[in-house]
Design a protein with these regions (language model features):
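A short, charge-rich alpha-helical start-of-domain segment used by transcription regulators
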Residues: 21-45, 55, 69, 133-135, ...
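Internal acidic/polar
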Residues: 10-19, 103-126, 130
Length: 190
């Protein structure tokens, strides 16, 4: 069964992106509280999709803005803050996924309830598929998982994924193929 994916960003993320884009006109990099209020919904939306676990999102958002506090002075263009925060979110999500996988290897992590990610009006069949996909994603290397989610769940174009992950375009394309192959195998056997 070939895996087909709607490459448009998820509706909730599109709403957040629209709000953030309209607010980008005046950005004060010295106002971290204002940056947090403006961009934390966007960072949380990206983190939720990458991690697949709501319980870790708040911690990741805080970590992203702690990194922002330390690194915001190096940002030259205030209009680039959203992309920079996305890049920090991706980097920290990859670290967190690697740590989670290590803990699962030694059975030090609890089972994840992926059904909580589904919208209230999601059918039982769709919830079951969501659980299967995220469980298959759990078996992937963290960076491969994140690249696949950026492309297929968040709808990011290749050039944006290259920028967000600091990988070459050929590496991103290879990891996308690897992820598709892995998901096809796992979902066919599930």
């Amino acid at each position: 069964m070939p895996l087909t994916v709607d490459r448009r960003p998820a509706p909730a993320l599109r709403v957040v992106q629209t709000r953030v884009a309209s607010a980008d006109a005046s950005i004060d990099l010295g106002d971290l509280d204002g940056l947090y209020r403006r961009y934390s919904p966007y960072v949380a939306a990206v983190a939720t999709r990458l991690l697949g676990r709501d319980s870790e999102v708040d911690d990741l958002v805080q970590d992203v803005f702690l990194n922002a506090l330390a690194g915001i002075s190096r940002l030259r263009d205030p209009q680039a803050v959203k992309g920079w925060l996305a890049k920090v979110t991706v980097r920290l999500a990859v670290r967190r996924l690697r740590k989670r996988r290590l803990l699962q290897t030694f059975q030090l992590s609890s089972e994840i309830d992926y059904q909580q990610l589904a919208a209230a009006d999601t059918s039982p069949e769709q919830k079951a598929l969501l659980v299967k996909v995220y469980r298959a994603l759990d078996l992937m290397p963290a960076r491969t998982r994140v690249i696949w989610l950026l492309r297929n769940l968040l709808g990011e174009p290749l050039h944006a994924i290259v920028e967000l992950t600091a990988c070459s375009q050929s590496t991103v394309q290879r990891k996308l193929r690897d992820a598709e192959d892995h998901l096809t195998r796992e979902l066919d056997h599930a």
